[in-house]
């Protein structure tokens, strides 16, 4: 553990941020998994709603610096591709 006051504060702050980031990352992954579950069931309406939620979570993660914008773009593109495949069928 740190001895210097500023280092102690940084350690506390870092731990808070780590917990917050883990929470946001978990919520993002959960939203994606929910979407993929609806795609498996071929439930178009619920899949469309879940896609919107997952897209928002990905965009929010980019804004907060959790993931890179290209990573979010790639994930959204793949999710959209899955959504379009069940809409077409």
From Swiss-Prot:
One of its GO terms (biological process) is translation. Keywords: Ribonucleoprotein, Ribosomal protein, RNA-binding, rRNA-binding. Residues 1-25 are annotated as: Disordered. One of its GO terms (cellular component) is small ribosomal subunit. Residues 7-20 have a biased composition (Basic residues). GO terms for molecular function: small ribosomal subunit rRNA binding; structural constituent of ribosome. Belongs to the bacterial ribosomal protein bS20 family. Binds directly to 16S ribosomal RNA. HAMAP family: Ribosomal_bS20. This is Small ribosomal subunit protein bS20. The lineage of its organism: Bacteria, Bacillati, Bacillota, Bacilli, Bacillales.
């Amino acid at each position: 553990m740190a001895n210097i006051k500023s280092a102690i504060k940084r350690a506390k702050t870092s731990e808070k941020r780590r917990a917050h980031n883990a929470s946001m990352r978990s919520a993002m992954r959960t939203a994606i998994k929910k979407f993929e579950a609806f795609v498996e069931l071929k439930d178009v309406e619920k899949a469309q709603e879940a896609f919107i939620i997952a897209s928002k979570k990905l965009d929010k993660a980019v804004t907060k610096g959790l993931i890179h914008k290209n990573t979010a773009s790639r994930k959204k593109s793949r999710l959209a591709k899955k959504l379009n495949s069940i809409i077409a069928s």
